[in-house]
């Protein structure tokens, strides 16, 4: 009798696993971190094949309160100083292990120049990673976000991760973070 239920058990396990893969974890909404209203209107065509990882090269944040302030600072710089329609990144990663929604999955970013912005999601780690690595919680948050994006169809199943320095002349995402993302399974050199 237990053999009769074995296929059903496998189907149940598969469905539960799929549900877990689609869990986007802790994404802090724009409203929760106090974002200014976006003035962006250009949509990003999905699914997206590329993800560009950068760092803000700014202050570190390691608590939800400090990361919310840092996300506001980044947005302020992009909107007020650079004249952009919003924060340039689709998502920001805090050292508190949380993902902060920037432009999100559906809006064209301003993170990697005119060639890559229309075809890539931009994820930026808040902090400077030239000489130190982000904490494991931040790296896990980024990996979880990418798995979610692929599971929900925002990213192609064979999406490719690039470092910011792979697509533009820059030191971003910092030497130490760059070493780490080169080990990620979806990393591909240009």
Curated annotation (Swiss-Prot):
Gene3D superfamilies, per the entry: Peptidoglycan recognition protein-like
SMART domains, per the entry: Ami_2 (SM00644), PGRP (SM00701)
Expression across tissues: Synthesized only in bone marrow. The mature protein is stored in the cytoplasmic granules of eosinophils and neutrophils but is absent from monocytes, lymphocytes, or platelets.
Keyword Disulfide bond carried by entry: yes
Keywords: Antibiotic, Antimicrobial, Disulfide bond, Fungicide, Immunity, Innate immunity, Pyrrolidone carboxylic acid, Secreted, Signal
One Gene Ontology biological process: immune response
Domain N-acetylmuramoyl-L-alanine amidase positions: 46-174
Entries under SUPFAM superfamilies matching the protein: N-acetylmuramoyl-L-alanine amidase-like
The keyword Disulfide bond is annotated on this UniProt entry: yes
A cellular component annotation (GO) from this entry: extracellular space
UniProt-annotated location(s): Secreted; Cytoplasmic granule
Signal peptide location: 1-21
Disulfide bridge positions per record: 24-148, 40-85, 61-67
GO MF term list: Hsp70 protein binding; molecular adaptor activity; N-acetylmuramoyl-L-alanine amidase activity; peptidoglycan binding; peptidoglycan immune receptor activity; receptor ligand activity; zinc ion binding
Coiled coil: none
Residues bearing PTM Pyrrolidone carboxylic acid: 22
A Pfam family of this chain: Amidase_2
Family: Belongs to the N-acetylmuramoyl-L-alanine amidase 2 family.
Function as written in the Swiss-Prot or TrEMBL entry: Innate immunity protein that plays several important functions in antimicrobial and antitumor defense systems. Acts as a pattern receptor that binds to murein peptidoglycans (PGN) of Gram-positive bacteria and thus provides bactericidal activity. Forms an equimolar complex with heat shock protein HSPA1A and induces programmed cell death through apoptosis and necroptosis in tumor cell lines by activating the TNFR1 receptor on the target cell membrane. In addition, acts in complex with the Ca(2+)-binding protein S100A4 as a chemoattractant able to induce lymphocyte movement.
PANTHER family: PEPTIDOGLYCAN RECOGNITION PROTEIN, PEPTIDOGLYCAN RECOGNITION PROTEIN 1
Subunit structure: Homodimer; disulfide-linked.
Protein's UniProt name: Peptidoglycan recognition protein 1
Species in which this protein is naturally found: Bos taurus (Bovine)
Gene designation per UniProt: PGLYRP1
